[in-house]
Amino acid sequence: MTFYLFGIRSFPKLWKSNPYLGLGPGHSYVSLFLSDSCGIRSQQRLFSLKTMSPQNTKATNLIAKARYLRKEEGSNKQVSSVPHFFSAGAAKKRSQMNPQSKDHALPSVRNTIQLPTQPLNSEEWDKLKADFKGKTSFERFIISQMAHSHSSVDVAKSLLAWVAAKNNGIVSYDLLVGYLYLCVFHMQTSEVIDVFEIMKTRYKTLEPGGYSLLIQGLIHSDRWRESLLLLEDIKKVITPSKKNYNDCIQGALLHQDINTAWNLYQELLGHDFVPMLETLKAFFDFGKDIKDDNYSNKLLDILSYLRNNQLYPGESFAHSIKTWFESVPGKQWKGQFTTVQKSGQCLGCGKTIESIQLSPEEYEFLKGRIMRDVIDGGDQYKKTTPQELKRFENFVKSCPPFDIVIDGLNVAKMFPKARESQVLLNVVSQLAKQNLRLLVLGRKHMLRQSFQWRKDEMAEVQKQASCFFADNISKDDPFLLYATLHSGNHCRFITKDLMRDHKACLPDAKTQRLFFKWQQGHQLAIINGFPGSKLTFQHILSYDTVVQTTGDSWHIPYDEDVVERYSYEVPTKWLCLHQKT
């Protein structure tokens, strides 16, 4: 029998009166096709589908001397081509230079079924199901793959009509939500409203994914305020997600309800959520048509929020910020996209970007927090004993302040083909020639004669640097942080470790930002060299990559669309805004 369903309004005729159909709200299967809608991107698909057609001067000088290889060695070009350790995209490039073996990756599960591109009748759906060889439910598999492939609403509608005809009018909740997802994706607002009416009749409550889809679909209609009621329904069970707030804010701005949008934004912040950048962008997009000082001040508060939480707008958001500034009447703002020189000077306006170095007050604050929260209170991040840590503290206090602290085991493994003790000795020897006070942190096994560790080379290391060898079960990071901070703001450290665990151990955004700022200003990276050759250290950034203003100028670092930036990296592109004089 040929069965096409051209209107969702005819669905109730196919269903029985029981309000709880199929699996019911909350079934975990719904998450399979809600990933995009709820702000979670799926990077892997289980099936492959085919579509059918119908300060210390010595330490400072070291940095200056080690920024580049000697000109006579002809290596300036080589050094300049290496991305900075903390620059956006640097980790991606390092991973490409050192690809990991993929020989043991599990093959993805594949199914040869082809998704239809046109609505099917009952006989055609019957045949497609008969050809299906998967172990899961055919209907669930099809609707999930339709969602992933963003199939047309009409094709999904024919699936639901076929299911209803085969099951005495019963359509399971997960199939209905899958259909709703496609309606939302294709912005079929009238269909969303029809599904909304059915769900109100059939279900007393929904699971969060269903609510989220309805909110997202309703905000584009003249019934957008009902999305606010759905938000209240979510609050009765759980805290709404920042995606829920984002959609409601977008709906309020779309329909010119500014007060509701700002109230929702404050409510979002009250939950300690970090707003989605598209939420903040929406305020700037709306603001270019608003000539109101109060609204303008709130947008400037958003920029301060970006600064305080070390957030970076994307390229599109940066364009929205630029457009808004240039639209403010009487202020004569002019924006341009630019970069910052290594000296910290903006190439756009010539102003100097804020220094990466912490103020004395910031340094003492951070030092106290790290000592308390990471060294003394961070047991979950270290493997050592209180006795050994105390022994180390006494050792450090008995020594003059160090200029450089070296993670010995980490540095020794930087060149895998070389003997580890030889690598460490080479690094220590070259630094010792600069008359720097060095501390090498290591493990006791490094002192035992072995293929990787020669006693004579380690004895030479101990002649040129102070050394502390911890138990083999200990972790070096707490020792490295303690020694570096105790030595003073001039002290640098060498390790490839990015210290993300320690940053996460800190209690608030302010302390985490200060830690990352301190790390960028003190961590030395070896970017060139091998045993017996001259080492090259990457320059330490002189400026802080953070949103900043001088009153008559703003400098806003932003993410390029084409660059993949890891959380411990910073953008290299800037939006420069200044007032014409």
Swiss-Prot record:
Its main location: mitochondrion. The keyword Transcription does not apply. Displays a distorted and non-productive active site that probably switches to a fully productive state only upon association with TRMT10C/MRPP1, HSD17B10/MRPP2 and pre-tRNA substrate. Catalytic component of mitochondrial ribonuclease P, a complex composed of TRMT10C/MRPP1, HSD17B10/MRPP2 and PRORP/MRPP3. Mg(2+) 2 binds at D477, D497. Zn(2+) binds at C346, C349, H555, C576. PANTHER family: MITOCHONDRIAL RIBONUCLEASE P CATALYTIC SUBUNIT, PTHR13547. Degraded by LONP1 following mitochondrial unfolded protein response, probably leading to inhibit translation in mitochondrion. Mg(2+) 1 binds at D407, D476. Keywords: Hydrolase, Magnesium, Manganese, Metal-binding, Mitochondrion, Nuclease, Transit peptide, tRNA processing, Zinc. It is an enzyme of class 3 (hydrolase). GO terms for molecular function: metal ion binding; ribonuclease P activity. It is found in: Mitochondrion. Pfam families: PRORP. This is Mitochondrial ribonuclease P catalytic subunit. Residues 340-576 form the PRORP domain. Its EC number is 3.1.26.5. InterPro entries: MRPP3_PIN_dom, PRORP_C, TPR-like_helical_dom_sf.
